């Protein structure tokens, strides 16, 4: 789900890239064998081939100078509280059920037999779309995971595992397979991407890029955005789950992008875009919106109390399906932000909509997206559902 940077790192350090068995990248690397060991000073890393998330998935067991197995880096095979999803293999002839069965075997033959005092370091935590129920912790003892992780139940059959792991998986963001292909086939140097993307543009240069098809991406806070933004801008603030929403909503990974960014955050923005494969940022507006010589749009925002006092309003909830199913405002429309690009036929451009999410970040993204499509009668509910449910 990210461009890993391994090619740049290998080029700059001289280190070799190591892949698990069956991998077929388009560049020089080591295709390791199961149980192959690599020395790092006095330490040893042993590759454990653990197919399931993908056919080549592998974990790395850390062995100290005395020969004690002390930690395991589990990648997307084992998370804290969850396991890797089995539906992301690129161009595989295996079904997700096939891969889930392989994952069951890998967990039970390669990881669960290890000692309980081994520390687990997974590749992702809460908020990632790579699993369904990940913990926000970053490390845990393997023994704790054996006791608490639903997918490591000692009495779990393979059939039960396959059903539970494959049930309720939401479609992956569209950029996932594109990132995987870039990791396999190569990508532009990050230095080149940053140099291209951090060019300070004059207003005229900025307008020229827009005229040639560039997307305006505004990465300020939602509070700053609603007070004034360049028409047709897409808001995705750096202060939220930036990479995930970029990947979900900017459907063309080669889209040319121009930025409205807080001063000093331009390089960070370009870098974070590149991490999910968006390498075609071509500059930022020098001076930001204060230097813009045209009109600025604004978004009306009301409090949850003001919403409660509004009669006959049409509410649009843009939270995820699980959030909606847990609780929602009676008679609200449900339009998950994740899928808003897919179908807007239920929304009428002549109707006024009060838009909310959980806390106020996603609702502003949604409103900016709808305004790009010609919707104008949109009101943001500040504080989102968190504020709504606390009103009298």
Region spans (language model):
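Rhodanese-like catalytic fold shared by cysteine-dependent sulfurtransferases
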Residues: 85-87, 93, 144-181, 185, ...
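Hydrophobic "anchor" residues on beta-strands that sit immediately upstream
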Residues: 72, 214, 313
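Active-site HxH/HxHxD metal-binding segment of metal-dependent hydrolases
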Residues: 1-47, 63, 68-70, 252
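Metallo-beta-lactamase
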Residues: 44, 54-170
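Active-site metal-binding loops of divalent metal-dependent hydrolases
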Residues: 22-23, 54, 77, 83-84, ...
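Active-site neighborhood of phospho(di)ester-bond hydrolases with catalytic His/Asp-centered motifs
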Residues: 1, 17-22, 49-52, 72-75, ...
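Long, low-complexity segments enriched in small/aliphatic residues
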Residues: 199-208
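Short, well-ordered beta-to-alpha junction loops that form the rim of enzyme active sites
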Residues: 122-127, 132-133, 178-181, 218-221, ...
